[in-house]
Amino acid sequence: MTEKKNRREKKNPREAKVTFEGLVTEALPNGMFRVRLENDTIILGYISGKIRSSSIRILMGDRVKIEVSRYDSSKGRIIYRLPHKDSKRTEDSKDTEDLKDTKDSKD
């Protein structure tokens, strides 16, 4: 009886996928992107349903985690948008603070 039970167990479909980190190089229509992986391979990535439903914006230059099937390595599903290490917003705010300091010193 246990032998039959073992044969009926389904394999986890996530085992057939490999996760990479990559950089979005081009935005295409309908939630599709060109992504350059860590090994310099460029693949076509599409947004997962969870990212689409939570309205997370993915733009050119964003770092993402992408899930690639072992059977078709030319396409992948974007499952996570990684946070920026060096955000332009923080650099811009520093620049504006420097400008304010120089204006104050002139007065």
From Swiss-Prot:
It is found in: Plastid, Chloroplast. Its main location: plastid. This is Translation initiation factor IF-1, chloroplastic. Component of the 30S ribosomal translation pre-initiation complex which assembles on the 30S ribosome in the order IF-2 and IF-3, IF-1 and N-formylmethionyl-tRNA(fMet); mRNA recruitment can occur at any time during PIC assembly. SUPFAM superfamilies: Nucleic acid-binding proteins. One of the essential components for the initiation of protein synthesis. Stabilizes the binding of IF-2 and IF-3 on the 30S subunit to which N-formylmethionyl-tRNA(fMet) subsequently binds. Helps modulate mRNA selection, yielding the 30S pre-initiation complex (PIC). Upon addition of the 50S ribosomal subunit IF-1, IF-2 and IF-3 are released leaving the mature 70S translation initiation complex. GO terms for cellular component: chloroplast; cytosol. Residues 83-107 have a biased composition (Basic and acidic residues). NCBIfam families: infA. Residues 81-107 are annotated as: Disordered. The keyword S-adenosyl-L-methionine does not apply. Transmembrane segments: none annotated. Keywords: Chloroplast, Initiation factor, Plastid, Protein biosynthesis, RNA-binding, rRNA-binding. It comes from Sorghum bicolor. The keyword Plastid applies. PANTHER family: TRANSLATION INITIATION FACTOR IF-1, CHLOROPLASTIC (PTHR33370:SF1). Belongs to the IF-1 family. One of its GO terms (molecular function) is translation initiation factor activity. Pfam families: eIF-1a. Gene3D superfamilies: Nucleic acid-binding proteins. Residues 8-83 form the S1-like domain.
